[in-house]
A protein has these predicted regions:
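A structural boundary/capping signal
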Residues: 1-169
């Protein structure tokens, strides 16, 4: 792991996003700037399950190769947004990692029902930052036979996200 190289690359991507973001953009427009930078300018790709090799589960390899699985791409996206002070949080959706764009910053992650109401829309970083709503989450949960629960809709703390990521890796 070349930590210095990784941090320089992430910093460069962050600066490229920062150049395009201003306070006059709507939350959706801000996410579009992130998407354009990551997926058009840098050409990051989400790998399908067949290509989901172990090395692409790690953020450093995903950054080097410009491709990764849903967690690696999602955590990179999350880190970039949070470094830019955008209220974006991880959501651990039954075997998928998505992001939530909130109205404002969340400090108490224990009240999942209240935090769920703070979500403006969801982002699928694995699918080029596609924005979607609770409706699509409900369709997905129905498809896999899972019961809807606030935990599948509410933003999670970074600690919770890292816990899920480690569980995914082992």
């Amino acid at each position: 792991l070349d930590e210095e190289k990784l941090l320089k690359t992430i910093s460069r991507i962050q600066k490229d996003i920062w150049i395009g973001i201003n306070n006059y953009l709507s939350p959706l427009e801000q996410m579009n700037v992130v998407n354009q930078t990551l997926f058009s300018h840098y050409q990051f790709l989400g790998l399908n399950n067949d290509d989901d090799e172990l090395r692409y589960m790690y953020i450093n390899n995903a950054v080097d190769a410009l491709k990764g699985n849903h967690f690696a791409i999602g955590i990179l996206y999350l880190c970039l947004c949070q470094q830019l002070d955008l209220p974006v949080y991880g959501v651990c959706l039954s075997a998928h990692f998505i992001l939530a764009r909130a109205k404002d910053y969340i400090t108490d992650f224990d009240n999942k029902e209240e935090n769920r109401e703070e979500v403006l829309f969801y982002v699928n970083p694995y699918n080029k930052g596609l924005a979607f709503s609770e409706k699509e989450i409900n369709i997905y949960l129905n498809k896999i036979g899972a019961q809807p629960s606030d935990k599948y809709f509410a933003p999670a703390s970074n600690r919770q996200v890292l816990f899920e990521y480690v569980q995914y890796l082992i």
